[in-house]
């Protein structure tokens, strides 16, 4: 499972001109679900998103997490993150989870996030969304939670 996190001053996501999710200071996390992902990857990715230190402390060092600052989290499903772009001029979506599986795992991640105590809102799975953000920094990180080798 992939999370592209961006430190934001504010962000919102719209569907058909209607705001379906927003946050003030916090994180915008674009989420890609891969074919072999399952609940352990959702749990691990969320743990990393909520604990990743991307906000400055008193000395200006990135030593605080979204939890530490009392920030919000906007989760947006984005299946294109799971694409294979290593060859050619067109992405292959073979590594991505099926739409049904991707939606189920995204909603599981969202449910876990809502249980975390951090204010959470979300985009809509498989919708044509417009994402607006004021990126703070910019600060952007690619996080992954991969299945363990059996």
Curated annotation (Swiss-Prot):
Span of the annotated motif Gly-cisPro motif, important for rejection of L-amino acids: 137-138
Superkingdom as given in the UniProt entry: Bacteria
InterPro entries, per database record: Daa-tRNA_deacyls_DTD, DTD-like_sf
EC number: 3.1.1.96
Disulfide cysteine pairs (residue numbers): none
GO cellular component, one term: cytoplasm
GO BP annotations listed: D-amino acid catabolic process
One Pfam match: Tyr_Deacylase
Compartment(s) of residence: Cytoplasm
Keywords linked to the UniProt accession: Cytoplasm, Hydrolase, RNA-binding, tRNA-binding
Principal location listed in the UniProt entry: cytoplasm
Reactions that this protein is recorded to catalyse: glycyl-tRNA(Ala) + H2O = tRNA(Ala) + glycine + H(+); a D-aminoacyl-tRNA + H2O = a tRNA + a D-alpha-amino acid + H(+)
GO molecular function: D-tyrosyl-tRNA(Tyr) deacylase activity; Gly-tRNA(Ala) deacylase activity; Ser(Gly)-tRNA(Ala) hydrolase activity; tRNA binding
Domain comment as written in the entry: A Gly-cisPro motif from one monomer fits into the active site of the other monomer to allow specific chiral rejection of L-amino acids.
Entry similarity comment: Belongs to the DTD family.
PANTHER family named in the record: D-AMINOACYL-TRNA DEACYLASE 1, D-TYROSYL-TRNA TYR DEACYLASE
Primary role: An aminoacyl-tRNA editing enzyme that deacylates mischarged D-aminoacyl-tRNAs. Also deacylates mischarged glycyl-tRNA(Ala), protecting cells against glycine mischarging by AlaRS. Acts via tRNA-based rather than protein-based catalysis; rejects L-amino acids rather than detecting D-amino acids in the active site. By recycling D-aminoacyl-tRNA to D-amino acids and free tRNA molecules, this enzyme counteracts the toxicity associated with the formation of D-aminoacyl-tRNA entities in vivo and helps enforce protein L-homochirality.
Oligomeric form and interacting partners: Homodimer.
HAMAP family: Deacylase_Dtd
Name of protein: D-aminoacyl-tRNA deacylase
Source organism of the structure: Alkalilimnicola ehrlichii (strain ATCC BAA-1101 / DSM 17681 / MLHE-1)
Lineage: Bacteria, Pseudomonadati, Pseudomonadota, Gammaproteobacteria, Chromatiales
Gene designation: dtd
